Amino acid sequence: MSIIVTGAAGFIGSNLLQALNQRGETDIIAVDDLTDGEQFRNLADADIADYLDQNDFIERYARGDFGPVRALFHQGACASTLESNGRYMMENNYRYSCRLLEASLELGVPFLYASSAAVYGAGRTFREARRYERPLNVYGYSKFLFDQRVRRALPQARSQVVGLRYFNVYGPREGHKGRMASVAYHCYQQLRRDGRVVLFGEHDGFPAGGHLRDFVAVEDVARVNLHFLDHPQRSGIFNLGSGRARSFNEVALAVINSVRASADQPPLVLAQALESGLLGYREFPEALRARYQSHTCADLELLREAGYRDDFLSLEEGVGGYCRWLARSA
């Protein structure tokens, strides 16, 4: 039976392909939009059975052309929180997802999809309940609205439906995302290019570099997806973060100290990084002030109740491994 991955050439989709391959799974149909031809690089080292454009795929999938399908991992979306074209966002993220959900329910195919912590907006409670969901941008709204569609469908669903609300994911194969790549990625590139890291200054009551996010390694994200593949009786919407909020300063330090370790140099603390000029700040961008999440931290209670017991990589472990991967890939 085939496994289908949409967004397969993207960041999380391509890492999911790698995780499936490591299990010996190769009967995989990869689905994406390769208008940006450079993204083929995320597919080049994956073993797959076929590739389809996302527009060609959806009609064939709805007709049942692929025979028995073990699961559909729907990772494809426009992930830019800065995208202002609401019509494009809703068609690509909401309407396309609705069509896949409807077809999956009709075919009885387990449907595991990417939601986002962006649904929570500027709130301080990150629990999978409607009263805590107040998105700040149209990207967050597109994910929020699809989650509501799923909630209405779940009571009648006869096959698995799982939504995973990704928090701040970082790791290999995200370079194509440009401005939307992770803080860790941008810190590493700044350090290599400019010899220093520059973070946003104070905003929303948080000091310079002190904004807090739940940073989660993409390896952990892939593992949680596979957990639900292995437990098709589990359905619902679940947070997927590390369960810990860490500051941008801590990410920058993890990058700086990883690079220093590769040069056999001792680690620095924050004050030393600032004093040496390896870390600095710039004024917080005016354009982001009204739509910026200053703090996120996943409540993992429902995920743990769904049977996922593994520990998540610490920020230092995950960022350290990522920096070594970036160095090898340069």
Curated annotation (Swiss-Prot):
Keywords: Carbohydrate metabolism, Isomerase, NADP. This is ADP-L-glycero-D-manno-heptose-6-epimerase. The keyword Isomerase applies. Its EC number is 5.1.3.20. Pfam families: Epimerase. InterPro entries: Epimerase_deHydtase, Heptose_epim, NAD(P)-bd_dom_sf. GO terms for biological process: ADP-L-glycero-beta-D-manno-heptose biosynthetic process; carbohydrate metabolic process. Binds 1 NADP(+) per subunit. Homopentamer. Substrate binds at N168, R179, H186, F200, G201, E202, H203, R213, Y292. It is an enzyme of class 5 (isomerase). One of its GO terms (molecular function) is ADP-glyceromanno-heptose 6-epimerase activity. The active site is at Y139 (proton acceptor), K177 (proton acceptor). Catalyzes the interconversion between ADP-D-glycero-beta-D-manno-heptose and ADP-L-glycero-beta-D-manno-heptose via an epimerization at carbon 6 of the heptose. It comes from Pseudomonas paraeruginosa (strain DSM 24068 / PA7). NADP(+) binds at residues 11-12, 32-33, 39, 54, 75-79, 92, 143, 169, 177. It comes from the Bacteria. It catalyses: ADP-D-glycero-beta-D-manno-heptose = ADP-L-glycero-beta-D-manno-heptose. Its cofactor is NADP(+). Belongs to the NAD(P)-dependent epimerase/dehydratase family. HldD subfamily. Gene3D superfamilies: NAD(P)-binding Rossmann-like Domain (3.40.50.720), UDP-galactose 4-epimerase, domain 1 (3.90.25.10). Pathway: Nucleotide-sugar biosynthesis; ADP-L-glycero-beta-D-manno-heptose biosynthesis; ADP-L-glycero-beta-D-manno-heptose from D-glycero-beta-D-manno-heptose 7-phosphate: step 4/4. Contains a large N-terminal NADP-binding domain, and a smaller C-terminal substrate-binding domain.
